[in-house]
Amino acid sequence: MGWWLFPILGYFIGSIPFSYLIPKWLKGIDVRKVGSGNVGATNAIRTTGPAVGGICLLLDALKGFFPVFITITFSGDSKIVSLTAIATVLGHDFPIFMKFKGGKGVASTLGIIFCLSWPTGLVFTLTWLVIVMLTKYASLGSLVALYVSALLGYLLKGYDTGMLFLILAVLSTLRHSENIQRLLNGTERKVNLFKR
C-alpha cells in the first residue's frame, strides 16, 4: 500500500462535515447561517444545544482519530502518521465537500491527540472545560489547550509527537485569527456548554 494513500484517506475523512450534516438532519439547522457561521463543533453546540453539538464534537474527534489509527496500524512510520494527521485536519478546515469552507480543526485535532497520547487528550479536555466554564470563551479554551498539549506531547511522547501537536496548534491558531482579534477587542462570542 503506497504511503501517500494514508494522507489522502485522512483528507477525505477529515472533509466529512459532521458539524453541518448532524444539525441539518436532526434540527433542520444550517450552521453556516447561524451563530458564527463556522462549520465546527463549537458553533453546533452554540446553535443546537449540548446534545446535538456533543454528537458533532464526538464525530469530528473520531474523524481525526481513525485515519491516524489506521496509519499507525498499517504503516507505523512516524512521518507518514504526521502527514496523515495534518492532512486530516486540513480536510476538516478546507473540506472538498463544502467548497473548502470548513471548521477550525480543534475537535479533529483532539481526536488525533487522543490517538497518539491519551493522557494528553485528557489534559486537553480538562483544560478546555475549565477555561470555557470560567470564561465562556470556547476559542480561548481551545487555543490554550492546544499549546498545553503540544508541550505535554513533547514531554510524554518525544520530539516527533510534540512537533506534530505544535504544527496542529499553529494551524488552528491561524484559523482562529478572527476570534483572537475579537478576544482582544472584548467582542468574542460566548458559549454556554449546558444550555442553548
UniProtKB/Swiss-Prot annotation:
Residues passing through the membrane, by range: 2-22, 52-72, 80-100, 112-132, 137-156
Q: Which InterPro entries match?
A: G3P_acylTferase_PlsY
Entry's Gene Ontology molecular function annotations: acyl-phosphate glycerol-3-phosphate acyltransferase activity
Tell me which GO cellular component terms the UniProt record holds: plasma membrane
Please name the pathway. Lipid metabolism; phospholipid metabolism
Catalytic reactions on record: an acyl phosphate + sn-glycerol 3-phosphate = a 1-acyl-sn-glycero-3-phosphate + phosphate
Q: Which UniProt keywords apply?
A: Cell inner membrane, Cell membrane, Lipid biosynthesis, Lipid metabolism, Membrane, Phospholipid biosynthesis, Phospholipid metabolism, Transferase, Transmembrane, Transmembrane helix
Q: Which GO terms describe its biological process?
A: phospholipid biosynthetic process
User: Could you tell me which Pfam families the record lists for this protein?
Assistant: G3P_acyltransf (PF02660)
Give a yes or no for keyword RNA-binding in this entry: no
Q: Which cell locations does it reside in?
A: Cell inner membrane
Q: How does it sit in the membrane?
A: Multi-pass membrane protein
EC no. given is 2.3.1.275
Question: What is the enzyme's main class?
Answer: transferase
Protein role: Catalyzes the transfer of an acyl group from acyl-phosphate (acyl-PO(4)) to glycerol-3-phosphate (G3P) to form lysophosphatidic acid (LPA). This enzyme utilizes acyl-phosphate as fatty acyl donor, but not acyl-CoA or acyl-ACP.
Q: How does it assemble?
A: Probably interacts with PlsX.
PANTHER family for the chain = GLYCEROL-3-PHOSPHATE ACYLTRANSFERASE-RELATED, INNER MEMBRANE PROTEIN YGIH
Say which family it is in.
Belongs to the PlsY family.
Please give the name of this protein: Glycerol-3-phosphate acyltransferase 2
- Which species is the source of this protein? Thermotoga maritima (strain ATCC 43589 / DSM 3109 / JCM 10099 / NBRC 100826 / MSB8)
Lineage here is: Bacteria, Thermotogati, Thermotogota, Thermotogae, Thermotogales
